[in-house]
Regions:
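Polyanion-binding interface signature
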Residues: 1, 30, 62
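Conserved ABC ATPase signature
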Residues: 1-25, 39-43
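Conserved active-site beta-strand-loop modules that form the wall/rim of enzyme catalytic pockets
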Residues: 16-17, 32, 63
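Short basic/glycine-enriched coil/helix segment immediately N-terminal to the Walker B
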Residues: 24-32
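Catalytic Walker B motif of ABC-type/P-loop ATPase nucleotide-binding domains
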Residues: 34-37
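Short alpha-helix of the ABC ATPase nucleotide-binding domain corresponding to the H-loop/switch region
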Residues: 44-49
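C-terminal lobe/lid and adjacent interdomain/linker elements of RecA-like ASCE P-loop ATPase modules
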Residues: 50-134
């Protein structure tokens, strides 16, 4: 049985994909710059990797700048450290942008683990919820 699903009932990942796919394909085919905030919001890890790899293989005269909270893309096999940046917010005093290659990671190092351990900055700081706050 084929029943169309209304857009609003699609998953967040499917909605996000359907929103960005036209611009994504247009930039690949026509060239230009694609800016995407929350690129992989709702995507399966395999889909976000596939899209980045596809863009890098097919886009001749195009660039993509995207923001993602997913660490899945911090793989040596997907992006190089000179293509990865972190943004660290300075408690109301602006932000600091750091290129991962500034730490000169070796090709055998696990970039995702380095990021999660705080080497590149950009990690959010969460305070413990105390009993007094309740």
């Amino acid at each position: 049985i084929e029943v169309p699903i209304p857009f609003v009932e699609e998953s967040l990942g499917n909605q996000n994909l359907l929103r960005i796919l036209p611009a994504f394909l247009n930039v690949i085919n026509s060239g230009g710059m694609l800016l995407i905030d929350e690129f992989s919001s709702g995507f399966h890890n395999e889909l976000e990797s596939l899209m980045v790899r596809y863009f890098m293989e097919k886009a001749d005269r195009a660039q993509m700048l995207f923001v993602s909270h997913s660490t899945n893309l911090l793989s040596n096999s997907i992006l190089r450290p000179d293509q990865e940046y972190s943004v660290e917010f300075q408690n109301g005093n602006g932000s600091t942008v750091r290129r991962f290659s500034s730490e000169q990671p070796r090709s055998a190092q696990n970039i995702e683990k380095m990021y999660v351990s705080g080497v590149f900055g950009g990690l959010p700081e969460y305070k413990e919820v105390s009993d007094e706050a309740e």
